Amino acid sequence: MFVLFQLLLATFAIYGTITYEEESRLLVPLICLILMFIVGRVEGRSTEKASARKDFLRSEIDKISQKDSTAIKEQDFFTIETLLWPKNEMILLDTVHAIFKDMGFKISTGIQYRSVDRIIKIPDTQKAFGMQVMMCEGEADRDHPKINRVFQFEKEKKENEKSLIIASTHIRLPISERGEASHISRELAGLLVRYNISFITAHHLYGLWQKAKRGEIDIFEFFQNIYSQGGEIYSPKGVEASLPPFHEFPIQ
């Protein structure tokens, strides 16, 4: 876009030199040259910023995977950034949708429900998840508005469907600081365990996606295990065991 604008300015400068008379003949090209210089500086800074951001992402990816991030495809950088540092929940949802589709799951908007973001089906089975996607500045907690939708889906879901939460937590923190952070409040974890609802952080989902792409895990088998087991919490710290029961959350 910057190049096209500079080309337009150059064309107008030539046009001004040919068309205008006296002072205007010099003034118009001069203004165009000044504008071209300014646009060039802006483009340079934009390129430097994009390069610095990519270097930061490479560094953060190396911390997650402990592998050389230079092998990562160019288009994956946007996916990674919007998964781990999302700007809004809609972009995060689109990214999670793309990841599950890339892994081979059947994913749809679940228009038959008003309380779920996506329906994810495990291929060649009748098993399905009603997925909610959450974005959290800190840890996921009971007060997040999506939690009410999760329990609404619990009332509406079919027998072969299970609730699944994908949460991008601590979105302002670098990867190095997320490993030791709490990603879900104790109260919410207890409720999810009680109602057999699984919780996966975006950080953990990224790791699963990369392992699936490298053929290190059978991703369908992994999610079949999630489906068959009780409510578990999958975070950068690993799989947390079932927690002590908390007070009942009323599903009315």
State the predicted function of each range:
Residues 45-87:
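Interdomain/boundary linker segments immediately adjacent to catalytic/signaling cores
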Residues 10-18:
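Juxtamembrane "helix exit" motif at the C-terminal ends of alpha-helical transmembrane segments
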Residues 13, 63-67, 247-252:
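C-terminal, charge/polar-rich interaction regions
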Residues 17-32:
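Hydrophobic alpha-helical transmembrane segments
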Residues 79-245:
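Catalytic core segments in nucleotide and nucleic-acid processing enzymes
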Residues 1-8:
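Juxtamembrane interface helix immediately N-terminal to a transmembrane segment
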Residues 31-44:
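Transmembrane alpha-helices and immediately adjacent membrane-cytoplasm interface residues
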